[in-house]
C-alpha cells in the first residue's frame, strides 16, 4: 500500500533513480527565486546532467553537488546527506539560514563541505567531527557563535578549516593543535575572547597557512611557531600581541608572507629573518619596534616591505635595492636617518614608496622610476635636499607625489608639471624656484596642486585652466605675479583657491561665477585692484573669504549678504561706501579695518547719518556727567575702598584665562565668563555642561564647560590654584586648535577656547533648534517629515565624512549620537562635539566614565567591548545607529525594546514582522521605498564586523544616490571569502600612509 501511495503521489518521479529522488526533495525544500534549479527535471532518468550535479564515472550515483551563488534560500537541506556517495557539497554564497543541524554527520562520505557566505546561525555542530572522510571545511562568512566544539580536535583527515567572519566568541582552543593533518587554519575576524596563541599550534607540522587576523590575541608569539617548516603564509595582524618577534621564526624556511601589523610588538627585528629565503612580503607596521632594519632581512629578495609607524632608527640598508621584484616600501613614521640607497628602483619594479615622517636627508635617487612603474612617491616631513631628478619628469606612471616639508631647491623639471596620471602634486615648504611650466596643461588628472611656501615666480600659465579635475590650488607664500589667467575662471570643480602672500595684480573678473563649488577663496596680501565683483555672491557654498591686504576699491557687493561665511576679511583695501546691512555688525569689526572710505555702524569706520547730531550734544552730556560725578563722589569713595581688594582679585582671576580664538570675535572672554550662570544651562552630558549665552551685540553662542577633575567635583572653575602650563595643557591646546581649524557647513563652528589649568570652555555657534535627539524624541519629532529627516541624515553624513577624509589631520569623533548632531534654523544638521572626548582626556582629568568609555550607551560599536580602541569604523557604527533612530524614532536603548538595543530590535523585527513595523508610523507611506533604502544603509553601517562597514565617503555617496534615485550601489556586496586583508583594503584610502 505504501508503494501504491508513492506511485499515486509522485507518478512522474518514478523514472528517476534514488539519488534523483533525493535531489528533488532538496529542490522542494529551498526557495529558488532565480529558477537556478529549473534543469532539475523529474522526468529524467538520472540527475547527472542537472546543473551543479556531478556523478561517478558510471553515472549511477551523485558524488558532487555545487550550487554556489545560486541565490537559494532556506534551512540547510539535511536530506542531501542521504546521497550515499556524496563527496563534495558547496552551497557557497547563498542565503542558507537557521542553524546547521546535528544530523549533518549523516553525510558519511563527505570530503569537502563549503557553506561559506550564507546566513547560518547558532553554534557549530559538534557532530561535524564525526564525518571521518572530511578534508575541507569552509564555514566563512556566516553568523555562527559560541565556542569551537571540543570535538573539532578529533578530526582525522581535515586539511582545511576556515571559520572566518563569524561571531565566535569563546577562546581559541589548544586542541586544534591535535589536527595533525591540517594544512590551512583560518580563524580570522571573529570576536574571540582575549586569548593567547596556543603553543600547541607548533605541533601542526603540515600547516601551510595560518590566518589569525583580528582574533583578539594577547600575550607573546610562541617560539613553537618556528617549528612550522612548511608554513607559507602567517597572518597575526590586528591583535594585541606584545613582546619581541621571536628569533625562532627564522625556522619558517618556506614562508612567503608574514603579517604582524597593528599589534604592540616591541624590541628589534630579529636578524634571523634573513634566513627566510622564500620570504616575499613582510608587514610589521603599527607596532613599537625599535633598533635598526637588519641588513640580513634586506638581502632577502623581498617584494613588499611595510614597517611604518614604529620607532626604528638608523639607515635603510643599501641591500634592499638589490631585490629584483621589490614593488612596495612603506616605512613612514619612524626615526630613520641617512640617505635612500642610490640604486633604489634600478633593479626592481618599484611602485609605491612612502618614507614620510622620518629624518632622511640627501638627494633623491635618480633611478626610482627606472622600470617605469612608480605610482606613489611620498616623502613628506624629512630633510631631503637638492633638486628633483630629471628622470622623474619622464615617469608617466606617477599618480601621487608628496615632497612637502623638505629642503629641495631649484626649478621643477618641465616634464614633471605635466605628468598625465598625477592627481596630487604637493611641494609645500621647500625652496623651489622658477615658474610653473606650460606643460602643466598635460596633467589632465590633476586634482590637488599644493605649492605653498616656496620661491616660485612668474605668472600662472594659461594652460592651468585646462585642468578640468582641479579641486584645490594652493600656492600661498611664493613670489607669483601678474594677473590671474582668464582660463582659471573655467575651473568648475575648484573647491579651494589659496593664493595669499604673493604679488598678483589686476582685477578679479565676473568670470568667478563659474566657481560654483568653491568653498575657500584666499587672495590676501597681493596687489589686486578694481572692484570686488558682484558675482562673488553667487558662490553658494563659499564659507571662507579673505581679500585683505590688497587694493580693491569701490563698494562691498550687497550680494555678499547671501553667503554663509565662517570667515570674512576685507581689511586693508581701498573700499568705500556703506556696509551691506547684514555685515554692519560688531562681530565683523575687524573684517573691514584699514578702509578709510568705508562707512557703517562699526567702531572705527566713518560715522552714520546721525553721528553729527550726536556730537552736538556731547558737550552737554559731559557737563551733566561731571556734575553728577561731583555729587556722587563722596558715596563712591566708600564703595571704591570697600571693593578695591575685590577688584584686584577679579583682575588677577581674569588675567589667568588664556583665550585661543579661531575666528574674528565680537566678544571677550570676560563677557563669556560673566554669563556662566546656572539659569543659562541648556544641557549637560558626559563631556561637560552647556550654557546659552546672549552677547551684548545681540548674537547668541553656546558655551561648553568641559568636565575636569576639580570642575566635576565642585561644579565651579577655580583659576586661583596657580596655573602652570604643562604637557597635558599643550596636548589639549594642540587638539583644540585642530578642532578650531575645521571649516565645513555641516560642522558646528568653534569660535574660541578659554582655559585655565582647571577649567576649559569651548565657545560654539548657537543652534536654535537644539539637538537632533531632543527634537526627534519630543512632541515635535512626529512632525518631522521624511524629507527633513533625509536632509538631516545627509548633512550629518557629509560633516562626519569631512572629519574622516578631508580634515588634516583626520579626526575620529568618538561620540556620534543624536544629541551631538545639532539642528540650525533651517533644519540643517551640523556635527558637534567632534574630538571633545579626546580633548577632555588629554587634560588628564576626565571623569572615570569618560576615560574608560569612548561613546554613549547604545551607540558604541560592539568591538569596543574587547578592544577598547576607537577608530573611524566606531564612528560609522554610531552613525548607523543614528540613522536607525531617525527612521524608527526610537531611542538606541529603550525599555520598549526589552533586552535588545535598537540595532538588534530592527534586525529581529525586520525578519519577523517586516519593515512596516520598523518605520516610524508618523512618516508618509509614499516614501516607503526610499526609507527602506536608507534603513539598509543604517544596517550596513552597524555591521557587527568593522571591516564590513563602508567608509563615510561611501555612505555619503550611497545617500546621494538614493536621493537621486540610483540604487545600484546598495546592492554591491563584497564577496571575499578568504578573509585576507591588508592595511589598504578600504575604498577610501587615497591618503593611506602618511597624512599631513
Curated annotation (Swiss-Prot):
Pfam families: LRR_1, LRR_8, LRRNT_2, Pkinase. The modification Phosphoserine is found at residue 851. Residues 640-996 are cytoplasmic. Residues 676-962 form the Protein kinase domain. It comes from Arabidopsis thaliana (Mouse-ear cress). The chain crosses the membrane at residues 619-639. It catalyses: L-seryl-[protein] + ATP = O-phospho-L-seryl-[protein] + ADP + H(+); L-threonyl-[protein] + ATP = O-phospho-L-threonyl-[protein] + ADP + H(+). It is found in: Cell membrane. Residues 967-996 are annotated as: Disordered. It is a single-pass type I membrane protein. Belongs to the protein kinase superfamily. Ser/Thr protein kinase family. Residues 16-618 are extracellular. Glycans are attached at residues 93, 97, 143, 178, 186, 203, 262, 429, 445, 569. Residues 968-980 have a biased composition (Basic and acidic residues). Keywords: ATP-binding, Cell membrane, Glycoprotein, Kinase, Leucine-rich repeat, Membrane, Nucleotide-binding, Phosphoprotein, Repeat, Serine/threonine-protein kinase, Signal, Transferase, Transmembrane, Transmembrane helix. The modification Phosphothreonine is found at residue 867. It comes from the Eukaryota. The keyword Translocase does not apply. This is Receptor-like protein kinase HSL1.
